[in-house]
Each structure stands twice: as C-alpha cells, then as structure tokens.
Amino acid sequence: MQPGGTAGPEEAPMREAEAGPPQVGLSRPTCSLPASSPGPALPPGCVSRPDSGLPTTSLDSAPAQLPAALVDPQLPEAKLPRPSSGLTVASPGSAPALRWHLQAPNGLRSVGSSRPSLGLPAASAGPKRPEVGLSRPSSGLPAAFAGPSRPQVGLELGLEEQQVSLSGPSSILSAASPGAKLPRVSLSRPSSSCLPLASFSPAQPSSWLSAAFPGPAFDFWRPLQAQNLPSSGPLQARPRPRPHSGLSTPS
C-alpha cells in the first residue's frame, strides 16, 4: 500500500472477503401450512392447496364425511308399530282412548248396546264411554216443575168451597188465604145439624164461616160483621123460607 494513494488491486478481494457473501435480495420460500390445519407437514416448496389424495382432517368438513348413523341416528319409519284400533290420525286423544278401550272389560262395553263396538269415530275428542244405554230419567215430573204443587191445593180448596156453595167471597178467601192449612173436615158439606144456608140473606157473610175456621186469616171479617149490625140489637138470622127447598124454618 502506498501512503496517500489509492488502494491497489490486491486490496479489492480482501474487502469482499470481509464484507461476507453478496446479498442478491432473494429470500428463502416459506412452505409452512396454516396453524388451523392439523394435517401432516408438507414438503418444502408446496405452497398450493393440499393434495386430494391426503385424507381431509379439517374441522369444517368433518360432519359431511362422518356416517349418517353417528351424526344423527334415526329409526326407520317402517319399524314403528301402528295402533290397530280403527282410529284416524286426526282424532285428538287417540293414544289414551286406545289404552282405555283395550283395558275396558268386554261386558261393560256391550251392555245395552245394539250396534257392535267398532272403536271411536273419526271426530271423537276423548275416551269412549261405555254404551250402557242411559237415557233421560223418566220421573214423570213436568219440565217446569220447581217445587210442591201449592197452587193445586188452593184450586182444590176453591173447588170444594164452590161445591159447598158458600155465599159471598168465602171461596176466594179460602183459596188465597196466607194463613195455616185449613182442616179438611170443615171443607165438607154441612150436615143437617148445622144451620141451613137458606136461613141467611145472600148479602151478609156467613156467620158460621168465622166459627168453623178460627185463625188470623179470618179476623178481617169481624169489622164487616160489626158494620152490618143494626143499632137496635145484635145480629139475628132473618128466615126466608123457600118453597122448593123443603126445609123448615127454625122456630
């Protein structure tokens, strides 16, 4: 080397050896697979899609290659037993009705039934009831029966009072009386020992009515009798003999 001069031709190879290998700018190709693929390592230089001959072990395509029996096992429909009870599919409650129909005794189903028991119809909504042949109770009572026939008793009393042929409103009083029940002995025809009806005037109420039917129901007749009393004395019977009655007037 000469001082103060340029480097000679021997110094150029020494500088290249100290600097190292020449950098061309080419990097080594990376052939590593993605981290999500758990398959075997491929040889370097194969950066394209994996070969079709290798078994696919990716997680997204696993359910497609698994057998159908392991993914979702289903029973074949041909092995399902159908109930042989004559029931249609559209009838609600067919399974409980079939169970009850099979458990019911034969005597209970055929009591009073004229038609043979063919199972439930298609429009049935519940279990079959035994055909016992029940109907409406024939009690003989009318449809509008609501209680004891009290108006009939009043009508009978009114008819009997009309047969006795009482004068005045006594028959209406006996039919519409709100008091206690009248004794049936007093409703019969008066015998000869009683006073005849012809001995009293038809305008005045019968005096034996208050005596034969004592009670609070006939208390309102007493003021009427008091108004009919004459001012001279007490009430007296006015005899009016009838020619065709054949009854003698009292002395």
Curated annotation (Swiss-Prot):
Disulfide pairings: none
Pfam families in the cross-refs: DUF4705
Biased composition (Polar residues): 225-234
InterPro entries for the chain: DUF4705
Signal peptide range: none
Species this protein is from: Homo sapiens
Region feature (Disordered): 1-93, 107-152, 169-188, 224-251
Ranges that cross the membrane: none
Protein known as: Putative uncharacterized protein FLJ44672
